[in-house]
Amino acid sequence: MKVVYDDVRVLKDIIQALARLVDEAVLKFKQDSVELVALDRAHISLISVNLPREMFKEYDVNDEFKFGFNTQYLMKILKVAKRKEAIEIASESPDSVIINIIGSTNREFNVRNLEVSEQEIPEINLQFDISATISSDGFKSAISEVSTVTDNVVVEGHEDRILIKAEGESEVEVEFSKDTGGLQDLEFSKESKNSYSAEYLDDVLSLTKLSDYVKISFGNQKPLQLFFNMEGGGKVTYLLAPKV
């Protein structure tokens, strides 16, 4: 098994978010894609990653290969990577994985392939009341600003706008609408409002680097879904349960 991806920063951004949620995870290298699904320690959030083989510079996978790893350890490896460097992940043995950071100098890491117990996660089919495509940078700024004053982020949807805000002693409100330019598209069935953990949203803000826009979907008493559609066909989905 051997795959090469041109920009190591993409994997770094994904693992950075993942490391905030779980201690261990499994990357599945299949014939047509690399996949990862992980449920956080408290079973409040879930992250799903699909990177099709077309995104990779090289992709040589004949049989499914599972790479179990410690997220913090892998993050330490990826931190040595610089801008525009590539990453090669290869294995000739089920017990270990070779990670090469390829740039002006090549760095090779021999990583033990861990036996990670995989949780049975049922297929989730949710019907949302609102789906909106908004600027990733705008979403990141909104969550960063709101999370500085509250533990709960309120997400509110109307027919023509999305609001991300803090309520209570300190009030902050960020509006996304077509008038302000932060809202690209909006699918609306009814007005909705929910509270979500500011900490859990702040933990995954590195995902906003994956695409210019993020599709957020939610509804009354329903999870918040963040969907990042990457250049080249990659997809990253993050689900977060509402506060009760």
From Swiss-Prot:
Could you tell me the keywords of this UniProt record?
A: DNA replication, DNA-binding
Single GO term (MF): DNA binding
Report disulfide bridges, numbered on this chain.
none
Say yes or no: keyword DNA-binding present.
Answer: yes
- Asked whether the UniProt record includes DNA-binding among its keywords, one would answer yes
The positions making up the signal sequence are none
GO biological process terms held by the UniProt record: leading strand elongation; regulation of DNA replication
Kindly give the InterPro entries that the UniProt entry links to this protein. DNA_clamp_sf, Pr_cel_nuc_antig, Pr_cel_nuc_antig_C, Pr_cel_nuc_antig_CS, Pr_cel_nuc_antig_N
Top-rank taxon of the source lineage equals Archaea
The UniProt family comment states:
Belongs to the PCNA family.
Q: How does it assemble?
A: Does not individually interact with either of the other PCNA subunits, but is recruited to a PCNA1-PCNA2 heterodimer; does not form homotrimers. Heterotrimer which circularizes head-to-tail (head is at N-terminus, tail is at C-terminus) to form a toroid; DNA passes through its center. Replication factor C (RFC) is required to load the toroid on the DNA. This subunit interacts with DNA ligase, RfcL, XPF, and weakly with DNA polymerase I.
Q: What does this protein do?
A: One of the sliding clamp subunits that acts as a moving platform for DNA processing. Responsible for tethering the catalytic subunit of DNA polymerase to DNA during high-speed replication. DNA polymerase I, DNA ligase and the flap endonuclease may be constitutively associated with the PCNA heterotrimer forming a scanning complex able to couple DNA synthesis and Okazaki fragment maturation. Heterotrimer stimulates the Holliday junction resolvase Hjc.
Q: What is this protein called?
A: DNA polymerase sliding clamp 3
